[in-house]
Regions:
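Extracellular/lumenal glycan-associated surfaces
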Residues: 39-60, 93-110
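Extended intrinsically disordered, low-complexity coil regions enriched in Ser, Thr, Gly, Ala
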Residues: 47-81, 110-125
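Amphipathic alpha-helical binding modules
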Residues: 90-144
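Short, flexible domain-boundary/linker segments around small modular repeats
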Residues: 4-39, 66-92, 133-140
Length: 144
């Protein structure tokens, strides 16, 4: 591994990786479109949940610091629709949840345009650590 190339790459804005960013946005927005149209599948939710976790991690790192309420409301909305979907097999949004998740998606897009590759790596580590430490709020509570 070339340490200098790694340092330079880590300072590169994610937005400079056009193909990656476009693919990510298409995947996220298609999942959101399916959710808003009442056609979301578990796979769509499996796309939106990591997106929301990533928004929260970047928020904690200072990207979108002014959007605390929007991040919290968006996470709550995703949790609620996910929980209902796990119970009845259909992922149907309520209007307030749709607004909250659209705002969360807009914040995610703005964060992706503002961060570097190194920031992305740090956010992934935060999400991974939260998962390993079981600090993430589960959609479905496990009963023992």
């Amino acid at each position: 591994m070339n340490p200098m190339a790694y340092v330079i790459e880590s300072m590169t804005p994610v937005a400079k990786h056009d193909n990656f960013l476009i693919d990510l946005k298409i995947k996220n927005h298609m999942a959101m479109t399916n959710l808003t149209q009442g056609k979301a599948t578990r796979e769509d939710m499996d796309t939106l949940i990591p997106m929301a976790n990533f928004v929260e991690a970047l928020y904690r790192m200072g990207f979108g610091r002014d959007y605390a309420t929007e991040v919290s409301t968006g996470l709550d909305a995703l949790h609620a629709v996910g929980k209902r979907g796990a119970e009845n097999g259909r992922f149907i949004l309520r209007s307030a949840e749709m607004r909250a998740l659209n705002t969360l998606m807009e914040l995610h897009d703005a964060q992706m345009d503002a961060i570097t590759v190194k920031d992305m790596e740090r956010a992934f580590k935060i999400v991974d650590e939260e998962y390993k430490q079981r600090r993430m709020r589960p959609i479905v509570e496990r009963t023992k």
